[in-house]
């Protein structure tokens, strides 16, 4: 979210994991995260298999629709911040309500993997809808925004056709056409696409949440992809739902499976004007916004990985530079227990980006170019340290009829590193609905826990 007395609008979030994949975020169950699903056959087992009776009858006919998949993810959480005077956690979007239990998301997905159509062509799709408090920050203007206006809203989050084309290079091109998650950043919207309940600053305030357009991944070599995309902008569509008349798009490269499969690196830029003509007029067509994102994940061994995510943002209209570096560490103590740690340093030069949307429709109205209620702070260098675990209780999961349960407690400390005091208190300003966070605390210690049921 962009917070500015000029009522501006810009790009904020989004989502990939270790590298930019060919298609939209795949839903991962906890058991799949970096662990083998089956063990390798022994020599004796291979001999027994060779002796097995062979069925020469023709297989039953298999059509394209047999591979349809449906998934549901339910996430609810609670957080505690006994020191707040505002009832909110400063600089948080999805986990903004302090000392409150929240139904964050019920996400339903219907998808089909990209399947061979013959002659090297493939076709698939993803349709996804989200209901819950998270939908406040995942709207796409022109696609059902404003149908619900309270704490709990709904939003279509993915609606794209996926295709593989045997064009240009030996390994061809992968296309996504339609509505999709933004591809920058490490922390995804889906609860299982991030290691923590809370988000880092870059995911909340810089990288795009949703885009509508076309994204192409050109496989130039075995470990090297070229990424290109054009879209309507962050969380907007076309016609009266656009932010301005200029296109926006991605450009970048991905290096996958380097160092014997241990290292993935992705570097992308997202470019184009993102301000709304309904807020600032025709200047919105020319005020450029630049977002650069570097993501590198190194797998130390089968149980341990380290990820580095660096992000830079500049907006010509806001005249603000925002940038940050986040380091993630993950270690599997057991198949059912993962330790996660995250450290971040994040700078908002003039305070035009980091803040809090106050109303349940604040972010939607910001995207629409309308007045909205928000709090902002002076330019601040933020530090953040989060530790937690992902616990998949075997005694529950072994007895569930469907899916699996993941519980993620976390402890988090946010701190101002340059002497400002934006946390836990705001002051009224002369502008109705706008608060200024400058007389609070220089740190915020809080704790959270969410539970995820995925099936």
Regions found by a protein language model. Give the residues of each.
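A generic structural signal for short coil/turn motifs at secondary-structure boundaries
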Residues: 117, 136, 236-240, 276-278, ...
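Residues that define the transmembrane beta-barrel architecture of outer-membrane proteins
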Residues: 66, 99-106, 152-157, 208-212, ...
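Outer membrane beta-barrel
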Residues: 59-235, 243-245, 255-260, 264, ...
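N-terminal periplasmic/intermembrane-space "pro-region" immediately following the signal or transit peptide
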Residues: 2-90, 368-372, 455
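Outer-membrane beta-barrel pore domains
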Residues: 27, 94-95, 138, 146-149, ...
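Hydrophobic secondary-structure block in the mid-to-C-terminal portion of proteins
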Residues: 11, 241-247, 433-436, 440
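Active-site-proximal beta-alpha loop/turn segments in soluble metabolic enzymes
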Residues: 195-198, 229-240, 249, 270-281
């Amino acid at each position: 979210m962009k917070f500015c007395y000029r009522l501006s609008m810009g790009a904020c979030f989004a989502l990939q994991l270790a590298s930019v994949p060919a298609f939209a975020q795949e839903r991962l169950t906890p058991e799949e995260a970096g662990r083998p699903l089956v063990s390798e056959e022994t020599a004796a087992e291979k001999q027994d298999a060779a002796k097995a009776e062979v069925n020469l009858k023709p297989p039953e006919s298999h059509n394209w629709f047999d591979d349809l998949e449906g998934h549901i993810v339910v996430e609810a959480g609670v957080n505690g911040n006994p020191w707040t005077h505002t009832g909110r956690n400063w600089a948080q979007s999805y986990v903004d309500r302090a000392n409150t239990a929240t139904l964050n998301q019920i996400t339903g997905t219907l998808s089909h993997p990209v399947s061979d159509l013959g002659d090297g062509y493939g076709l698939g799709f993803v349709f996804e809808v989200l209901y819950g408090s998270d939908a406040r920050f995942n709207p796409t203007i022109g696609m059902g925004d404003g149908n619900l206006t309270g704490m709990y809203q709904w939003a279509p989050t993915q609606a794209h056709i996926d295709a593989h084309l045997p064009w240009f290079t030996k390994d061809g091109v992968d296309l996504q056409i339609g509505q999709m998650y933004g591809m920058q950043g490490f922390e995804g919207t889906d609860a299982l696409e991030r290691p923590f309940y809370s988000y880092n600053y870059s995911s909340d305030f810089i990288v795009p949440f949703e885009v509508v357009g076309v994204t192409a991944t050109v496989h130039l070599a075995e470990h090297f992809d070229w990424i290109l995309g054009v879209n309507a902008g962050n969380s907007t569509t076309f016609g009266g739902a656009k932010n301005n008349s200029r296109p926006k798009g991605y450009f970048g490269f991905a290096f996958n499976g380097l160092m014997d499969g241990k290292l993935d690196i992705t570097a992308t830029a997202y470019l184009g004007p993102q301000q709304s003509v309904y807020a600032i007029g025709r200047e919105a067509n020319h005020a450029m916004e630049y977002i650069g994102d570097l993501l590198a994940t190194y797998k130390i061994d089968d149980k341990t990985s380290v990820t580095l995510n660096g992000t830079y943002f500049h907006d010509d209209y806001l005249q603000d530079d925002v940038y940050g570096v986040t380091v993630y560490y993950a270690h599997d103590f057991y198949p059912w227990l993962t330790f996660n740690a995250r450290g971040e340093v994040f700078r908002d030069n003039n305070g035009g980006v980091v803040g809090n949307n106050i109303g349940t429709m604040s972010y939607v109205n910001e995207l629409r170019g309308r007045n909205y209620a928000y709090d902002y702070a002076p330019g601040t260098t933020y530090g953040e340290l989060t530790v937690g675990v992902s616990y998949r209780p075997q005694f529950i999961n072994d007895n569930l009829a469907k899916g699996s349960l993941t519980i993620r407690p976390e402890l988090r400390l946010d701190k101002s590193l340059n002497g400002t005091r934006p946390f836990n208190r705001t002051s009224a300003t002369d502008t109705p609905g706008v608060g200024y966070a400058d007389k609070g605390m220089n740190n915020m210690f809080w704790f959270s826990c969410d539970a995820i049921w995925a099936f």
